[in-house]
Amino acid sequence: MAKKPSYIGLLNAIANGERGGYELFKAWSDTTDDPLLKPVLDMIAVREMEHSWAFEKRLTELGFSLRPAASKDLKKQVRFLKSDASDEEKFASFGVGGKTLAKSDVPQEDGLLQILADRTIDPQTGALMGRFISEERDTGRQLIKAHRALVRRTQAVK
């Protein structure tokens, strides 16, 4: 058997993190009363789960299996997103709103390119990571856009 690639732990962490992301966005989607926000949350939830499956698949292609990780923080956040808290409060729990709303057009360092810092990553894994980075950034843009729309709708009602 070939030597274990240095990035196996990273693939495992991403797969677990994205599975948790699915749980978060699905919980929020299931509880929002906003018919315009729900499809955005559903798209993000599906994207998160697809990322989890893609990274788990890559692990198996490399001869390894996913090591599931439990998180008390995840369970706590899922409970919050299933609660009757407002969508505005739920956006805030993801760091969207307030100051983020005003500065959302300014490119900010997100650290995602650090994922590709390992020069031993094979081309297939690198391509998967590149797509992941692009889609994660798009998810951030979609959340900011959805938040702005929510704020506009809320202000129009007042």
Label each PLM-derived region with a short phrase.
Residues A2-K158:
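Non-heme di-metal
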